[in-house]
Amino acid sequence: MTAENLFSQWDKAKAKYHNFKDMGMVKVYTSGSLLEDKEIPLEFQQRVLEDCHDLKKELVIESRTEQITEEKLEWATKHNPNFTVAIGLEAYDDGVLRFHVNKGFSISSWDRAVELLQKYALRVKTYLMFKPPFMSEGDALLHGVNWVKAVAEKSDEISVNPMNIQKGTIIDRLYRSDQFRPPWLWSLVSMIEQTHAFIHPKNGINGDEDQVSRLIIHPTAGGKPRGAHNCGDCDSDVVAAIERYSVSGDLIDLEGLSCQCKEVLQEEISLDGSLPNPLGVGLRRRGLSRLNLRKT
């Protein structure tokens, strides 16, 4: 990919969307880092930063922690003093980062990067993973709650990404051999309920003065076998409620949710610590209904 290719793509995007006229936000994700000098030419980085600043559009980029340095941020903020940097932290736990995710950096690296971003008055978006490989449902819920609490005060936004199954991956092999089940939607609801007081100390909603951060959850393939799901009967209602909460930050959006399969999850979590293998795998992974659903 040459600089000319990147400039061409950028110019076509601006032309297609009329300089992003009806858009308040522009996300430039390169599946790594816009600030990676070895892959992204400096002149293209500068163009993106300056164009979004001149157009008065909120710019969101991704970066790995090692690309966030004093020198780099000093340079970048000269071209755009107000943008958001999203970091895929995945887990606020060095053991999980090393043995479950193989992330390649530690939480101290994330802490250092966030301190620098805050020094330059840049916004921080933190990605967390819910139920990474080799983790039971109960552990995923416990860790997920703790990680959200740990990063809330240092993050303007927290995006929790429930594990989904992509073909050709290690997690796909575990899934096909009945050693991993994507997370339950009920677990995501429980995580929201347990962390809401840390996001909104006065039980407010998004936009209120008490808001510490914003919690966002949009389950990829939600309600499907390879994404976060319940029994199949209540999935659409629960996914819709989770997504409404992500917009509003109001617990009222989770009221009225009910299904018998919630009891199956509670039993699964209660037995997690006493069985050699986690429950919730195999053909019965959906819970009470659709027991003969085949893997896809």
Put a short name on every predicted segment.
Residues 1-40, 51-68, 82-110, 157-159:
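Core AdoMet radical
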Residues 2-14, 40-50, 105-111, 140-148, ...:
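Well-ordered, non-membrane alpha-helical segments in soluble/globular domains
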Residues 15-21, 48-54, 74-82, 115-119, ...:
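Acidic (Asp/Glu)-rich catalytic clusters
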Residues 32-34, 65-67, 91-93, 130-134, ...:
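Active-site-proximal loop/turn and secondary-structure-junction residues that shape catalytic pockets
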Residues 38-46, 69-78, 138:
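Distinct, well-ordered alpha-helical segments
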Residues 81-83, 142-159, 236-259:
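Structural recognition of alpha->loop->beta junctions
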Residues 108-169, 189-219:
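Conserved C-terminal portion of the radical SAM core fold
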Residues 165-296:
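Auxiliary Fe-S-binding modules of radical SAM enzymes
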